[in-house]
Amino acid sequence: MPELAKTYDPVGTEARWQQAWEDQGAFHPDPKAPGEPFSVVIPPPNVTGSLHMGHAFNTALIDTIVRYQRLAGKNVLCLPGTDHASIAVQTILEKQLKQEGKTRHHLGRDGFLERAWQWKAESGGRIVGQLRRLGYSVDWQRQRFTLDEGLSEAVKEAFVRLHEQGLIYRGEYLVNWCPASGSAVSDLEVEMKEVDGHLWHFRYPLSSGDGHLEVATTRPETMLGDTAVAVNPTDERYAHLVGQTLTLPFVGREIPIVADDHVEKDFGTGCVKVTPAHDPNDFAIGQRHGLPQITVMRKNGTMNKEAGQFEGLDRFEARKAVVAGLDELGLLVKVEDYRHSVPYSDRGKVPVEPLLSTQWFVRTEPLAARCREALEKQDPRFIPERWEKVYRDWLTDIRDWCISRQLWWGHRIPAWFVISETGGKYTDTTPYVVARNEVEALEKAKAKYGAAAVIEQDEDVLDTWFSSGLWPFSTLGWPDAESADLQRWYPTSTLVTGFDIIFFWVARMTMMAGAFTGEMPFQDVYIHGLVRDEQNRKMSKSAGNGIDPLLLIDRYGTDALRFALVREVAGAGQDIRLDYDRKTDTSATVEASRNFANKLWNATRFALMNLGDETPAQLGDPDPAALQLADRWILSRLARVNRETAERYSNYGLGEAAKGLYEFAWNDVCDWYLELSKRRLNPGENPSAEALADQRVAKQVLAKVISQMHQMLHPLMPHLTEELWHSVTGKSETTFLALQPWPALQESALDDALEASFADLIGAIRVVRNLRAVAGLKPSQSVPVRFVTGRGELAAVLNQGTADITALTRAESVAVMAPAEADAAPVAKALAGVSGELQVLLPIEGLVDLDALKGRLEKDIAKAEKEIKGLAGRLGNPNFADKAPPEVVAECQANLDEKQAQADLARKRLADLS
């Protein structure tokens, strides 16, 4: 068998196995291969992006799931890909052009797109390379990009079909408009920011001259587009005014006073200015009352001719000018400081404007209805279940989806305007045809408008989420219903994603899938939480607390980071915390996982040194009749952990699986079984035939436990376990642990009573070790040990384990007694300890300086009493007990209880020695 290096080199090991898996096509499944299908399409990161901790967390969860399913015998496809990220890429390129003194219009559409593809080729692979470093067991040969030819055809097909069904239409509606990028943006691309602004109160005079109404707004510049003032129909203060008109300052327009239930009569003055062309709520009021929609702002953020004297001013300059003008007219009542949420363009980094614009929309209600119906059958199933309500609420309270963007990089809308019908130019009244390509479009145009029809394709592109919504099935070959991948792996098995895009991505995928495949696109939706810092703050660029995963990977290794992230999960969907020292680029949490990796490495080296040249297969299974107590215990633990871990992996209990395996590997295997096996693995010179037979049994058990431990840990720490498993099994480098079956569960090995009794034996050994430390015994000193218990089964286990106890405690002798027997032969000058129902006595007279030991105990008591006094005083202080955070008070009480217990124990030991 190959020899393991003394120390673990994670970076070199990980790179080698990643290359080996890829070279051998380990994760490139054949759709015709046997096994139940299991498929996951990864959420496609933007090509502009770089790896952040959210990606690392998502990857760790997905890869743990798919690697287990592979071990469980499934035919697994994990399909990777990237998103073209229309706005993000275009923003980057336009910034580059600006530095060159150019705009995209200098290049023209074709030239700009050529540059975009060149940029994608040069820079777009960065995040893919970073994802590879995470050890993703995906099929890189099936990697997709949302602008790939096949996916582009799927997008066109989807658009055409939805249009033919009347579910895509063109109309003028309010959209989020980013003046910086000159495009409509989706709700997801809008970030709400808390800002310190103002609330301006001003009066609108009644046209009759008999008074005024007072309104308030955070956007005074929009008042130029007001077409009404609304009051609540039950508000008696204004009931007599409904139907009258007000005169709008500056423009002199008369606007009606309308009654609408949207108005809260107890908020402010109970009067709301209505600007249908610049506010979504006002737009709805305007629709209900047939109000005109007056746009006062251009798409570049300057005021238009409808703004009268303010035409040409930037929107923020206009705000100041309008306020100053109202003040001059005596209409400004007051200005209040006001902290409120303002929608910002995520890409343009400027406040967005709700603007009326002619755009393409998807009629979402018919699509959402199909999803709601499926959800009644838990299709898909949400983990945790609480997110199902969030998903249902989004599908219930839904608006039509604006899918057009005024950009060049992206899926160009497959619609052609018949410009020959409007004098050879595009106008708002130009008719259009929708088609899969220009040839089909021209045929449709000629059929409808005559042979002389001239067409011109829409300049706009589709919202990135349109193509992302097709991701689960377009990547598998749709619209080709005969696609082998589509037939084998669709619907997909599990979607793993964050809660923040349940509507923006999850719901759009289910709506699209329902429309085009008649099925929901995934069976399960696993919603994970956020990665937070040590202060429980969400990690983000704006907070400046993000962590570059590659820094931690370079320092500790990919497996250490992955294991740390998954182990932190306290339950499906829960946020996790990750500490990080920015001065040293270190993380205690990830370092602990690296130490665990080193522990596994050293345990495997120990096994290799003791197994000789025999592999687990060559050693075979031990004879059950020849098993020692420790063997039966560790094999029972192995079977139990096997069963629990498989259940946890299968049911998304990934954090619980990681914690359970950590405890098993570190405590049961490394701390106890390896220590207990040492004397048997090294029987000394001229061993007896019985000792040699027992040595072989110990080797057989050790080989089985170590190799299966590697298998069970593989989904969590794939590179490390692949390396260690190969070293133990001697398999060739083209035979992968990643593709082996999950270890068979040995039900017959399970023994609840034995595990409970052995836990008592471990407790007894711990107490003896602790008493030796209290006494200050040297490691070379042997001392008799006396155990006292009234439990017969515990006494039997202690008697069976006498040799183990002697070896691990350096006991001179071990005596197991019943209470009556111990009372009949009392021991003087002994240290006593307790473990459950077991009393442990360590006679030390003649072995240590009793006076010195008593002196140490008296010092311990004095120190504890001083700390007790301080803690009790703190808790007795009302300023602390009543005002400190509850968790701080609870921690103080716990410290007090601990110190009191320590003092009581020291007093008892002092009394025993007196």
Swiss-Prot record:
Which segment of this protein is annotated as the motif 'HIGH' region?
Answer: 45-55
Q: What class of enzyme is it?
A: ligase
Q: Is Coiled coil included in the keywords of this UniProt record?
A: yes
DNA-binding is among the record's keywords = no
Coiled-coil stretches noted in the UniProt entry, renumbered to this chain = 847-914
Arranged from A to Z, the UniProt key words for this protein are:
Aminoacyl-tRNA synthetase, ATP-binding, Coiled coil, Cytoplasm, Ligase, Nucleotide-binding, Protein biosynthesis
Q: Where is this motif: 'KMSKS' region?
A: 538-542
Catalytic reaction annotation: tRNA(Val) + L-valine + ATP = L-valyl-tRNA(Val) + AMP + diphosphate
- GO terms for biological process? valyl-tRNA aminoacylation
Q: Which SUPFAM superfamilies match?
A: Anticodon-binding domain of a subclass of class I aminoacyl-tRNA synthetases, Nucleotidylyl transferase, tRNA-binding arm, ValRS/IleRS/LeuRS editing domain
Write the Enzyme Commission number(s) for this entry. Answer: 6.1.1.9
Q: Name one GO molecular function term.
A: valine-tRNA ligase activity
Q: Which Pfam families match?
A: Anticodon_1 (PF08264), tRNA-synt_1 (PF00133), Val_tRNA-synt_C (PF10458)
PROSITE patterns, alphabetically? AA_TRNA_LIGASE_I (PS00178)
Q: Name one GO cellular component term.
A: cytosol
Top-level lineage group: Bacteria
Entry binding sites for ATP: 541
User: Where's it found, cell-wise?
Assistant: Cytoplasm
Q: How does it assemble?
A: Monomer.
Please give the record's comment on domains: ValRS has two distinct active sites: one for aminoacylation and one for editing. The misactivated threonine is translocated from the active site to the editing site. The C-terminal coiled-coil domain is crucial for aminoacylation activity.
Could you tell me what this protein does? Catalyzes the attachment of valine to tRNA(Val). As ValRS can inadvertently accommodate and process structurally similar amino acids such as threonine, to avoid such errors, it has a 'posttransfer' editing activity that hydrolyzes mischarged Thr-tRNA(Val) in a tRNA-dependent manner.
Q: Which family does it belong to?
A: Belongs to the class-I aminoacyl-tRNA synthetase family. ValS type 1 subfamily.
* Protein name, entry field: Valine--tRNA ligase
The scientific name of the source species is Parasynechococcus marenigrum (strain WH8102)
